[in-house]
Amino acid sequence: GDSATFTETGKATYTAVFKDEDFDTQTVTVETPMKSSPEVKMIKNGASVRTSEPYGIRWAAGIRTADWNKLIEVYGENNVKAGVIVAPLDYVKQADEFTISAFNAASLQYADIVSDSFNAEVNAMAEGYSGFYASLVNIQAGNLNRKFAARAYVAVEKDGVVTYYYGEYSAENQARSIYEVSKSAVASSTEKETVKEFAKGVLNKVIDVTVENGNAVLTEIAGYA
């Protein structure tokens, strides 16, 4: 099964174990084009190393604060959630679109990272937005050079129907590997030494992986965690 662990305010982490995943849901889901209000987006292009244990790769996402407050007013706090869908880039290319319903329909594995609160550090990155970090941790060695993509969303539930509003997505801006972000961390003049040590460990573990059509392919590992 899957699990989400909330470790710090506005910092959701997700450890994914996808073997024998059951994709059945208890509610109907409806996908809505990103041009629909409310406005949700990735606060920063790219990704970074998660700076506390367990280390991993993290993205900064957010929703326009005025839109979030209106949704809470209309639907109630328990019926609104902000999150990020994360999946291997090669899976994104297989799906009809990068949405939860498309991945479920294709039986493709993904992580649905839901934040339980907003983070002041991310809020400060974009005026007028409430933001959070979404992290994928405990990535197996065979996936260190594999790109993972992320897309922000906000979802509302009414009468058993869940409606998703997605932010823009592009692989160029939102797909990174832990190898790539580790290289950036090591080169940084401001990153903590503990994070740099983790990043150096990642770089030391990365070996040549099989590449097919430009995609890093899993070695003999069942799922990723």
Residue ranges and their predicted role:
Residues G1-K35:
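Extracellular modular ligand-binding repeats in secreted and cell-surface proteins
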Residues M34-A225:
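Short, surface-exposed linear motifs at loops/turns and structural transition points
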